[in-house]
Amino acid sequence: AGGNTAGRRADAIAGTGGDGGNGGNGGLLSGNAGAGGHGGAGGSSTATTTTGTPPTGATGGNGGNGGAGGTAGFTGSGGIGGNGGAGGTGGNAGVALSVGSTGGLGGNGGSGGLGGGGGSLFGNGGAGGVGATGGNGGSGIGPASVGGNGGKGGVGAAGGLAGQIGNGGSGGSGGAGGNGGTGDTAGNGGNGGAGAVGGNAQLIGNGGNGGGGGNGGTGATPGTGGAGAAGGTGGTLFGAPGTTGADGT
């Protein structure tokens, strides 16, 4: 996870979460591939900014991205993609008499990692990783204060391609947007992340389901929901397509 910041300046940005590592590949003949690691969470801004004209809160750190799942060889399942890390919370700003203080921005959520492909002959594709939630905005304190805007939700990742026989991996869902911070006027909500397409089947098997979009965060202007994604195609000989993910609200 990224480190928190206790800095009181608006440019005291919290640390970014680290990215997850990629999963290992399956054996040349047989064996399942490894899953990708999850992204670390972004740090949060923990101190209230009291200086500046007007005071502005520090920004939360962005979450790290998930690692990709590994690819299978001849037979075996593809690796699952890692999930993104959550965005950090923005810092508070102002004192009781400060005018027009603004809370810090929430960090953006990390994106999911790609699902790995199934074995070339037989094997299911790995599911794509899920996008993470954006961080909430910080609070503004005092007259005419404004809350910080919420961070964006992370984007889901595509599901892996199936082997000649096998099902495609599900696409990852998008993360929700962060909520706007409090103040005399609330901050705006962050937009939800988009879902990702499901993996395709090839000869025999079902397509993976598409990921749904994340919901927008609450705020003076709510965030927009992310778009859901299409499912993967079914096998050319036998198999059904995946379902389409729902749009976020």
Q: Where are the language model's segments positioned?
A:
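Collagen triple-helix signature
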Residues: 1-248
